[in-house]
Amino acid sequence: FQDRMGWNLYYAWYMYCVVAWFVVDGKWVEGLPLRTGEKLRYKINALKTGAIALGFAMTIIFIKGPASFTLLYDHFPGLLSAALVNSILQAIYVYAASFHGKKLLALGGNSGNPIFDWFIGRELNPRIGEFDIKTFNELRPGLILWALLDISCVCHQYTKFGWVSDSIVLVTLFHIWYIVDSLINESTILTQMDITTDGFGFMLSVGDLAWLPFTYCLQARFLAFHPIHLGWLGVLAILAVQFTGYYIFRVANLEKNEFRHGRNPKGTY
């Protein structure tokens, strides 16, 4: 909590994501019908937001060298603390806001127990105008930050040892692959349970903003100070597992998305 630089970095990052949502061009799509029959509109520009951020990071590394981008690695505790506080404050805000006006409440977060409802999420789609807080946090601040944290870990390893291990390269590339895939398929999250059924409370807030980026990057963080050399056989074996797993993951998710949209006539309950 005393790492002022870490806090400043995190909130500067979060504000970038918010500003990018408003100013970066993106198409608008409709979500699934709500219980009321209404369909909400969502702005799809997470991929462009991520591309700008990653492009900026790579430009810094190219111009100033890897040592210039170890800042995220060095200020990891401060970044994590700021993310936790941000997630708690957002959970408090959306819970309080759910009592004002006619809000559509989540069936599972309207128990009457304030602690439970705050944790699970009372309002289904908390918004400020057309800015949807839940879908925004789902893909942007945490997911893209995960990629930046991984890259910072690679830079730390290179700065400390003068070389980069094959293991950390694979971990980082696979993580970024998953992240970019998620950003490309941003509209598919609109059919997922997190968006259609769950309210937005502390559970999703801390999961999206703190748990996801700061635990998912731990493999790269460990390898940053403990390099492991796999060799060509190890690399090829891991690549085979990765490609197989990704194929299953993507095909299964696309099939689920098509079924939820009613576009898969072969699908059955």
Placement of each model-derived feature along the sequence:
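Membrane-anchoring alpha-helices and their flanking helix-loop junctions
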Residues: 1-269
